[in-house]
A protein has these predicted regions:
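N-terminal positively charged helical leader segments and presequences
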Residues: 1-91
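RNA substrate-binding interface of SAM-dependent RNA methyltransferases
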Residues: 2, 87, 93-190
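Fold-independent oxyanion-binding glycine-rich loops
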Residues: 30-31, 42-43, 65, 106, ...
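Glycine/charged-rich beta-loop-alpha catalytic/anionic-binding loops adjacent to active sites
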Residues: 38-40, 97-101, 212-215, 233-242
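Active-site/ligand-binding-proximal alpha/beta "capping" segment
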Residues: 186-223, 227-229, 237-240
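Structured adenosyl-cofactor binding patch, chiefly the S-adenosyl-L-methionine
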Residues: 226-268
């Protein structure tokens, strides 16, 4: 029996838990992963050496953001590069069966950071920030690019922390009309409204038990303007209310995501 067989013979059979025994989990880009080796460079190398203070023979759980996870042992660490030996590879079924896209109006302050982090933890598939007519923060293209870089990093870190194997994409900020024009494969398109005269969430869940692709929109602090609601309805979005109480914009997305995952997804 070779080393790989010895290692694999002692792994738990449940693929959800194969690599959770490793004390540290990191993301490594697929281009730095070969059949038998993983290479660490730059900031990630610095983190492993100086922050985590790991040494040769220590083991790590590594994910590549494309659905694969690895158990790896450190072979060498220098100030310039690190090398890990792959001891096992798996494709654990940790992603939600739902393909959820969140269209989130730009909120004030740093609330978008929080929304992205928690939405990723709750299993969102993709995030689409947008400007609405009542959006308060506005920024230029240069500022927008910096924000997207930070938000994508937040998505990566939230995936790493929560055990996800994919990293949700945070798309560039667009105007509301541009968002509505985006092609979508979602079988359900929802615009969340505080007006309880719109469709109820309970009825929505009852009549859509078998739907898997969902695209939902959350407005800014002041809510959607009437003309925006009309535009969304013209593009096939259905209005749904979360009840009588008024929720903050950063609460709405997380509430709806939690309910979707519990009722239709994998939150058991």
């Amino acid at each position: 029996m070779n080393t790989r067989e010895v290692f694999n013979s002692h792994l738990p059979r449940n693929p959800n838990h194969i690599f959770t025994s490793a004390p540290h989990r990191i993301f490594v880009s697929p281009e730095n992963i070969s059949k038998e080796r993983i290479i660490l460079l730059g900031e990630l190398l610095k983190k492993v050496r100086l922050v985590l203070r790991l040494k040769p023979k220590d083991t790590l759980s590594v994910f590549d953001g494309t659905g694969f996870e690895y158990r790896a042992q450190i072979v060498s660490l220098t100030p310039h590069a690190g090398e890990l030996k792959i001891m096992g590879k798996t494709h654990p079924p940790r992603e939600s069966p739902l393909e959820i896209h969140l269209g989130q109006a730009m909120p004030k302050s740093q609330k978008m950071d929080f929304i992205i982090q928690k939405a990723v933890e709750l299993g969102v598939g993709e995030i689409h920030p947008f400007f609405s007519s009542r959006t308060i923060p506005r920024f230029n293209l240069s500022q927008a690019m910096k924000k997207i870089e930070r938000w994508q990093k937040i998505s990566q870190e939230a995936s790493q922390q929560s055990g996800r194997i994919n990293i949700p994409t945070v798309n560039p900020v667009v105007e509301f009309v541009e968002l509505l024009a985006l092609p979508s494969q979602a079988s359900l398109k929802i615009i969340l409204q505080k007006d309880s005269s719109h469709g109820s969430l309970k009825n929505f869940l009852t009549t859509n038990q078998n739907k898997r692709g969902i695209f939902f929109l959350v407005g800014p602090e002041g809510g959607f303007a009437p003309e925006e609601i009309t535009r969304a309805l013209d593009h096939g979005f259905k209005p749904i209310s979360l009840g009588e109480r008024i929720l903050r914009t950063e609460t709405v997305a997380l509430t709806f995501l939690s309910i979707l995952q519990y009722e239709l997804g994998d939150m058991t």
